[in-house]
Amino acid sequence: MAKGGDVRVKITLECTSCTRDSVDKKYPGVSRYITQKNRRNTPIRSELKKFCPYCYKHTIHGEIKK
């Protein structure tokens, strides 16, 4: 049986270019992905390159607070 709290936590990744740019786009909004990370292996905030449907390109998605 597992001891203590959960090691794997759910995190939300948000597009960094959508939050910075307020350029008039076809669809206004912010791209977000939900994933998991192991708190022991990666204690720092994670950043992944994912596709943003609002920017129409692959951008850096950073972890945000809940």
UniProtKB/Swiss-Prot annotation:
InterPro entries with a match to the protein in the record: Ribosomal_bL33, Ribosomal_bL33_sf, Ribosomal_zn-bd
Single GO biological process annotation from the record: translation
GO terms assigned for molecular function: structural constituent of ribosome
Main localization (coarse): plastid
CC annotations in GO: chloroplast; ribonucleoprotein complex; ribosome
Keyword Ribonucleoprotein: yes
Pfam families (UniProt xref): Ribosomal_L33
Keywords, sorted A to Z: Chloroplast, Plastid, Ribonucleoprotein, Ribosomal protein
Location of this chain's protein in the cell: Plastid, Chloroplast
UniProt cross-references to HAMAP family, sorted A to Z: Ribosomal_bL33
Protein family membership: Belongs to the bacterial ribosomal protein bL33 family.
Annotated protein name in UniProt: Large ribosomal subunit protein bL33c
